[in-house]
């Protein structure tokens, strides 16, 4: 299944919900472009990975690029609801420490409220 992206504002965070696969080509490029467009407009982006079936090296690259772009703009890019395969890939590649991870989108939103207090 190709990647579909849905962007919305929830609380004080911008959420990008991903469904499908984040792979080399149009999918990874679309996610990178979406993150780059949102970063100057917000302080926090959460990428909801609950609908992601597969991610490859290019997909990981898009996520890492998003984190680096965000850091340069005093913004954060965080991951919510990564499945077991994504978590295993992040651990295997030693990239797990690069990302702020939340088990669910709700947990990310609650964390956002805690930061605002």
For each predicted feature, which ranges?
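Ser/Thr-centric signal marking residues that sit
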Residues: 7, 93, 104
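Short acidic-hydrophobic, aromatic-tinged amphipathic segments that line or gate anion-handling sites
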Residues: 100-104, 108
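Conserved catalytic submotifs in the C-terminal HATPase_c
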Residues: 10-11, 50, 82, 106
